[in-house]
Amino acid sequence: MKISVITPSFNQGRFIEDAIRSVLIQDYPDFEHIVVDNCSWDNTLEVLQKYPHIRWVSEPDRGQSHALNKGFRMATGDVLAWLNCDDFYLRGAFHTAARVLSDPHLDGVYSDLQFCDLNWRITKHYQSHRPVKFLSLFHNFISSECFFFKRRIVDNNILVREDLHYCMDQAFAASLLYHNYRLRYMKDCFAVFRWHGANKSVDTPWRRSQRTREGIRIFNSHNGFVQLDEENPRHRQLYAWGRTLLKPYRVFLKATNDIDDKIHHHKLGRWPSFGRASRRSAGEI
């Protein structure tokens, strides 16, 4: 089972080598790593040229979503994954994902996510939960760094929405559920999100407003009973209330993760939990 990793890139030369090394240390026999770069002017291309196994292009694109879709179309693997430049995989992620996805009835697998700072200290553990259709219209339950999915999804023309710049991962996950693809949640961590202060997910009032608007677009795309107007302040407030009201349900889902894990019997050789990320865990030996 070949795994294709897609990395969208723009001026992240100081981090991208850790992402590349974290793919190499998986010790997985059949993989490809594709980097889609948006004409970076830092040292990104110098780093990429050090690794001849990487397939990469550096050309103008229309943003992260467009770069991802270009990479997905270039990919030749049976399983696809999306790793941002400033994040990295933990050891064992590929083998575990491949074992789970050997089930022909499954379409994707995702896990929890760890956060680390610039000093490699683990600062947060994000716990996900099993997939729920309606909840996916309000909350993103899949961390893109921790998601592996089968190529047939892209072959069926389900791609990342290019009109979204903050919630495209939420929209992609919701689209999979509403097209009845089967996803499996695992109580492990496949990857680490590096928090450096310039992340796209850093919260500001403007970005919060944009995420609400994009969330409304996702909601409108999949529900058949009501449409909200993202330009209407009352509708934006209504959507925000919906997110707040559903938080207790998310807490309940997370509380039942242990029960779900026992039911599904996916004890597939867990690797050690990392209390602290390190350069070794990102591939520097």
Question: How would you label these PLM feature ranges?
Answer:
Residues 80:
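Short aromatic/hydrophobic "clamp" motif used to bind/position activated sugar donors
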Residues 126-214:
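Conserved nucleotide-sugar donor-binding catalytic segment
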Residues 88, 92-123:
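Conserved donor NDP-sugar-binding/catalytic core segment of glycosyltransferases
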Residues 14-17, 42-50, 92:
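Acidic helix N-cap motif at the loop->helix transition within catalytic regions
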Residues 59-75:
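Glycine-rich, basic loop-to-helix element that forms the pyrophosphate-binding segment
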Residues 22, 29, 37-46, 60, ...:
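A conserved acidic beta->alpha catalytic loop
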Residues 1-24:
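N-proximal low-complexity "stem/linker" segments adjacent to membrane-targeting elements
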Residues 220-285:
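Membrane-proximal basic amphipathic "stem/tether" segments
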